[in-house]
Amino acid sequence: MQKSYIKLLVLGDSKTGKTTMMMTYSTGSFPTGYVPSHVDATSLDIEYNKQVCHVGFWDSSALAEFDNTRPSTYPNTNVIILCFSIDSPTSFENVSKKWIPEIRQYAPSIHTPIILLGTKCDLREDENTINLLKENNQMPPISYKQGLALSKEIKATMYLECSSLCNQGVNEIFKQVVRCHLYCKDGVLNDPTTTTSNTSKCIIQ
């Protein structure tokens, strides 16, 4: 039986843990050595509800030098993961300031599913992180409620959180990618196989 192919585009500010998250998923463990700013496109088979899809991961760099070439990564994208880091208010603000306008301009369809992902959720209660943000006159780590509100504001398909360091919620992200591809129609997720929320705090809009 031929597998469906999913082109997955991962977006978000630099240092939000996009590449680390993908490496953690593909290897099963948190990378302890050098982590590049982005990795070349790779692919893996992922199963959801007994259906296996071949998912191609496109890790898009957020560096300014790639602003002119990044639009070329959008064509044929089936699902987008848009990341912000829970310890970075700036990356949170840039979701609606920078990334959503870019997505609306270049995504192949206004109905392309978007998973808003809060990374590094292990830092939400971290004392050093909280103190550092306070010293820099920044808002505290992003709360779950704030992330959920933003996902509704940008009309994301769902909101998830993860910690690559703790390997929390990472596997679930990619199951939800397949789920979005299989069951999203006109931007609405209608999965007949489940009516309950999952363990990674998946909120369906």
From Swiss-Prot:
A lipid is attached at residue 202 (S-geranylgeranyl cysteine). It is a lipid-anchor. One of its GO terms (molecular function) is GTPase activity. The keyword Transcription regulation does not apply. GTP binds at residues 12-19, 59-63, 119-122. Transmembrane segments: none annotated. Pfam families: Ras (PF00071). Residues 203-205 form a propeptide. NCBIfam families: small_GTP. Belongs to the small GTPase superfamily. Rho family. This is Rho-related protein racI.
